[in-house]
Amino acid sequence: MKTNLADIRKEYSSRSLDTKDILPSPVEQFRLWLNQALEAGALEATAMNLATVNEAGKPASRIVLLKGIEHGSFVFYTNYKSHKGSDITHNSFGALNFFWPELERQVRIEGKITKVSPEDSDTYFNSRPYQSKIGAWVSDQSKEVASREELESKITYYENKYPEGSVVPRPAHWGGYTLKPAYFEFWQGRPSRLHDRIVYDLEGDIRWNVFRICP
């Protein structure tokens, strides 16, 4: 039976959102919602869509995992030589989007992306499981590879080079980024597609302007 995509719809009605109900800090409001998503058992609650733009102005997006909120900025880790790494090198502005369907909520965040310190990258890398560390050496992320067997061969090579229980150094091409927010939108699903949308817009690195926008 063929599904008519135009007929697929869901009515949202479980919650509401108003400016009088939110916290003064968008980061603290985000922490509140994230904790509620975790408590609700949201699947991959820390998963976020990261959107970047390359030097030709072409956008790309992919799912990455939030690994921390440090000094009000959002931290993730990746291969610096990946497509996203190249995009960030040429255009440091990006956007994040978290979607928690269990709570009928999403959060959109815009800001500037910079690398975290090598020390912070080392600390996180050293906390990873052994096979994840090996994987960082094996994968030339976003580059063409001839076969799965080629990847498996590289796994064996690096497992022999860095046996389990030994120190696996962090590759220089692998590390963290942090997105410093300048804009947040908190979205709460409501009936008849008249959703609640509350914005925090940073003014001059000092003050957050808070207002409602139309659905």
Curated annotation (Swiss-Prot):
This protein's UniProt keywords: Flavoprotein, FMN, Oxidoreductase, Pyridoxine biosynthesis
Cofactor binding note: Binds 1 FMN per subunit.
Pathway annotation from the record: Cofactor metabolism; pyridoxal 5'-phosphate salvage; pyridoxal 5'-phosphate from pyridoxamine 5'-phosphate: step 1/1; Cofactor metabolism; pyridoxal 5'-phosphate salvage; pyridoxal 5'-phosphate from pyridoxine 5'-phosphate: step 1/1
Residues at which substrate binds: R9, K10, E11, Y12, K67, Y124, R128, S132, R193, L194, H195
Gene3D superfamilies noted in UniProt: Electron Transport, Fmn-binding Protein, Chain A (2.30.110.10)
EC number: 1.4.3.5
BP GO terms, sorted: pyridoxine biosynthetic process
Chain positions recorded as FMN binding sites: R62, I63, V64, L65, L66, K67, Y77, T78, K84, Q106, Q141, S142, W187, R197
Function recorded in the entry: Catalyzes the oxidation of either pyridoxine 5'-phosphate (PNP) or pyridoxamine 5'-phosphate (PMP) into pyridoxal 5'-phosphate (PLP).
Protein name: Pyridoxine/pyridoxamine 5'-phosphate oxidase
Species of the source: Cytophaga hutchinsonii (strain ATCC 33406 / DSM 1761 / CIP 103989 / NBRC 15051 / NCIMB 9469 / D465)
